[in-house]
Amino acid sequence: MPRPYKCRRISEIPKVAYYKPAGIPLSLLEENQLSTEEAEALRLKDLLGLEQAEAARQMNISRPTFQRMLYSARYKVADALLKGKALRIEGGVFELDARPCCQRQIPPSQTDPPGQT
């Protein structure tokens, strides 16, 4: 049985979720899909300039996982830009800031202050 998928933490949902080359009808374009977590990895590393270890900590993932996610995101963006493809940002398993994620239940012993269980 595979390990359960760990939710990634993001700070905001991208305001724009679709990019395409100008002047080409959408029906004629191939499309790359970038997950919301991949977009967050790009934002943290390339836009904010954080070190990978700090960016991974903010997303609640390991540094190797962050690096794989960043590589995948950069590949998809470069492929879309250089080959004239559309880019859709959607999907993924993530939590927005400190809101609960993935219907996962946290045992009361981990959320209650000491002496409150």
From Swiss-Prot:
Assigned protein family: Belongs to the UPF0251 family.
Protein name, as recorded: UPF0251 protein DET0218
Family annotation (InterPro entries): RNA_pol_sigma_r3/r4-like, UPF0251, WH-like_DNA-bd_sf
Transmembrane annotation, as ranges: none
Gene3D superfamilies: Winged helix-like DNA-binding domain superfamily/Winged helix DNA-binding domain
Organism of provenance: Dehalococcoides mccartyi (strain ATCC BAA-2266 / KCTC 15142 / 195)
